[in-house]
């Protein structure tokens, strides 16, 4: 497993932005900034949290996919030897560890969905996974917002927001506030 520096993560995000520009890049930067700040206050490695935040959506470098960005990001980072970042790319959209709560299109094959589900089941989440899940739930492309505002925005755009996922986000917020 390779250690990922902030500089390397920024270069990877910049390359991804050239391949597939969009608001997801600024969102990733805000996730990273929030993760770094919260990590520093909670006794976690702020630099590690920042790099993981930068790369949580790195699968978007391959296009504008929905769940495909999770699958693609995980495999891309694994190939590069960044297991921790790959795990975060995998877990960031699934705060309950299940595909059932995914908000968006299932734009991968049934076979890839099964692989993704198995990877999620095997993932051993830690505070960095939880932190990026929280920061993903408070960061937009325009900055950090109240968690309820962000979840309502997603609900407006997709037409629903699973209650179980909503409740877990509130739980994560409380976890890092304590």
Model-found features: residue ranges?
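Amphipathic alpha-helices of TPR/Sel1-like and other helical repeat/solenoid scaffolds
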Residues: 31-35
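Acidic-glycine-rich active-site phosphate/pyrophosphate-binding loop
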Residues: 2-9, 48
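Divalent metal-dependent catalytic cores for phosphoryl transfer on phosphate-bearing substrates
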Residues: 14-17, 41-154
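Generic N-terminal amphipathic, Lys/Arg-enriched alpha-helix
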Residues: 6-21
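Non-catalytic interface/linker regions that flank or bridge core catalytic/transmembrane domains
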Residues: 1-2, 161
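Charged phosphate-binding loop/patch that engages nucleotide di/tri-phosphates or the phosphate backbone
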Residues: 157-178
């Amino acid at each position: 497993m390779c250690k990922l520096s902030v500089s390397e993560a920024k270069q990877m995000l910049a390359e991804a932005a050239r391949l597939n520009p969009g608001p997801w890049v600024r969102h990733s930067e805000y996730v990273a900034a929030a993760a770094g700040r919260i990590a520093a206050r909670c006794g976690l490695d702020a630099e590690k949290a920042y790099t993981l935040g930068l790369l949580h959506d790195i699968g978007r470098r391959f296009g504008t996919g929905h769940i495909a960005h999770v699958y693609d990001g995980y495999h891309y980072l694994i190939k590069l030897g960044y297991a921790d970042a790959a795990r975060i790319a995998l877990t960031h959209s699934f705060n309950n560890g299940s595909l059932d709560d995914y908000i968006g299109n299932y734009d991968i094959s049934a076979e890839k969905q099964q692989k993704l589900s198995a990877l999620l089941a095997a993932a051993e989440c830690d505070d960095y996974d939880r932190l990026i899940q929280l920061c993903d739930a408070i960061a937009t492309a325009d900055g950090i917002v109240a968690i309820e505002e962000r979840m309502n925005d997603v609900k407006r755009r997709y037409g629903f927001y699973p209650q179980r996922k909503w409740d877990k986000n509130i739980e994560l917020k409380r976890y890092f506030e304590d």
